[in-house]
């Protein structure tokens, strides 16, 4: 395509004369016929291209194929007007000898025809022919048409500037989209593991044969072999001694467990490991437990028990039963674990031999087996729940149903979800609900405002312990902004503007080159602009500040042009930071440069006008002239007075806008709910068009700031050191920068609020903001504070809210040059339709569950905090008013260090159970006192005003389950291998039955009884002379004979065990001393032996005594004869240990494969633990908690589905 003709240029005569007097270039033709008055014609240019064999289409839009570019017409075809001063300078230079002509003047010569060599005006490279130079221009400089009119020095500066900004390609949309996907994926991965389904049995207690059966009749032996041969699982254990053992998830099927198990061995093994989680490491032996920390460890064991059972009973395939008694009943098939079938429905079994198990199973009600009168399919859809009768213990079922209540409280209805998404997306998405959504969906995505506010306070707690943790939140939001914004940064906008400036100067430093050098990003910080915007959403956690390296040297003066440029760049960039002191800092940066000609009063001890500007970072050091510009005399300091007036008049006015959804809750602490504060004025987003604006706050700030520095350049103070030509050049550069058509001001006013509103609704950490205070000294926020303790229970200054944990805030230095380039070089697509763009950009944000992750974490934070605080409070006598079911278990009054250890144990348990990475309650245990843990946040202003918010947690579902578990533990502690009541050490020889854990009579003696002595606090022995036996000193300090009845508190026994072993225990074995050891609760073990052989438990007791020390004791050993199914001749046995009260509730049955027990403990299957199976009067849906754990009952199995957000609603904008 032929190029369009150039317009005829009309120039002044004076300019023509100046051009004719310019000396020719060194490589100009020696011909005397040199045309110096006109440019080559269009025809001549086309002819030259044809000779060179160049297609006109290859020449480019800039006309680089011309034989010689015109020096009087710019790229847009406008006439270049040359100032008279430049013409005079050219005439003067023409009279100089050739030796003094500089390169800048030489390269500005009008090209001559027929040169010997062709020189590139961009890079000064020489070429032998026009075709070679044209090809060079086409390949190397085609994208830089504006540089064809600039000098090589400026061109070199432009090249360096553009190369420095070449890293902007790293922020290209394709890279940012990848970052967006990674962020959303990582956010989903950060969500707590709320859904764990179990298709197995809902039970945490296993029925095991603790002692295998022996001495069975031949018929029973044959039947047992038959069942084993065909791998038939007996419905009930058939050992000689069968016990109920706590073992969570032993019958689970489906999803993996939560990573926490409570698996206690039968009492024949040592179980102390479960009761030494905390306050034991390093000083309690592996075979011991500490009675003084028993409550804390029991609480943690029960917490683990609850957390391991936070599951949903999942429905599975049902099949029709074909057994005789229960034919036609619908039962679960348990295809993956068929051995569970016999255990789940023991009432289906028909045992051929009359045994204890058979007698019990004969009482089973057939209708209490399998599914209860409810179809599994309703209207062609699987029903949401199915009620079944099967093996399930009531405590586990209660915990799981309580957890389901928690999930239901978090459920979001699809209609509400669409409302939330539309409001969070500012109605830029076209979303709807599919009409065929099933009623069985469960979307646990909701968190109340109270939970979100608590989570925000916890974020502040964790960040105040580690300020570096706040910076990744800004980086993440910065990446999201770059992923969705249509604004791109194009530095060539700036270079194209300033290269039209004529630079005729004798200065050694080119002004244009210097400003381009200063505008290069420091440290390749291309994203400083986006970091500033992201920091606005977290201005309570992160504070963007101008980098100290960017400030001019305070020892320089205003006549040092690089320092003046730096001051201007700081001033332009300052409103983009969230630093409340940035206006003062930029004011003082100019005051530093004007310290000698324009002195002002500082009125702060130790600070002067020459103090580096970056040190003015507190309202108390703001100069009075800045606070009130009227205090700066115009005659004495005209520039500083004008600068202060400019800042006060044009500094942007903060605003706010709506974000999020009221239905989603709000985590704002200091800002009204669902509002986001903004440091600039904002306006609604135009839906259809965009256009550059020149009346916005940012446009005004850029224009007035540059206008002020034009005044500085032309001020009388600059005249002695800056010549007129330099001032004109600088004025031209500033004017060009002021007139740049950038889209950034429009973006800040109209588009950025929408982006922040949408992204702030989906980020993992919600916006954490404090108000922007502009320029009012008394309103300036000096600290954001957090207290980890209850304000009503603070006892010393070390935990005072003003003395600790100030976190305003983590400083994030940013490069002002990068910010200024972004302000001046913003660009959007010419055909941009904002509603279409944002509809596509925001759609991926709402296709996953990422936006609800923070809600889920907020709920788990609440649950963990309530449980941790309650557990710590239960380990002391005062503190928070919480229920204390386990107050009877011994526990020393914990210190703050011990409380911190307990707190971390609970925190780790919750993080493991819900698979949470990162911090949960970590910061709460690092400082302060967890015994009075409570959270208050506040911000402190300069005038002393404190805005405080107390954020107490709401009620906790898991804590409710924990309290019920604690109360149940008191009634069923034998199921956890824990005994209650004292123990006796009394010699008891017998040939008969012996049941040490089931005393059949009243205790032999008790404290306060006749002739009962209580040992003193130290168990001190009083030695007597002349062969008399030693005496024990009682609690009244009176020596008493050892023979007799003694009360020994366990702590006294621990500190005097050596005395007891040497002097008291031998008399117990001899039958002369009876001892009652006062120990309210203890871990025990059982030791079974054959009654036909001689036996004594003295050795067991001596081993037990040898393991006692002041730090702990081993489990209490009880010796029990094995129950016999036939007549036997027993031997004499001597026992020394038995319990003061019944501790045999974990005994399920004895010799259940026979009809009776002839000798030893005799226990059949208790109907009290199976009312739902055998009691005709059983009320469905009831249980006997906390008094008894039943092992069979009715439960609901659920067919929930858990869709993603894209499965709940349909978005057309996502296509």
UniProtKB/Swiss-Prot annotation:
Composition-biased stretches (Low complexity): 21-44
Keyword Zinc-finger: yes
Keywords: ATP-binding, Capsid protein, Helicase, Hydrolase, Inner capsid protein, Metal-binding, mRNA capping, mRNA processing, Nucleotide-binding, T=2 icosahedral capsid protein, Virion, Zinc, Zinc-finger
Entry GO CC: T=2 icosahedral viral capsid; viral inner capsid
UniProt GO molecular function: ATP binding; hydrolase activity; RNA helicase activity; zinc ion binding
Location in or out of the cell: Virion
Transmembrane segments: none
Zn-finger segments (C2H2-type): 118-141
Record InterPro entries: Lamba1_VP3 (IPR054176), Lambda-1/VP3_sf (IPR044949), Znf_C2H2_type (IPR013087)
Region entry Disordered, spans: 1-81
A Pfam family that the UniProt record links to this protein: Lamba1_VP3
GO biological process, one term: 7-methylguanosine mRNA capping
Predominant localisation class: virion
Oligomer and partners: Homodecamer; each decamer is made up of two conformers of VP2, called VP2A and VP2B. 12 homodecamers assemble to form an icosahedral capsid. Interacts with VP6.
Function per UniProt: Inner capsid protein that self-assembles to form an icosahedral capsid with a T=2 symmetry, which consists of 120 copies of VP2, with channels at each of its five-fold vertices. This capsid constitutes the innermost concentric layer of the viral mature particle.
Annotated family: Belongs to the turreted BTV-fold inner capsid family.
Protein name: Inner capsid protein VP3
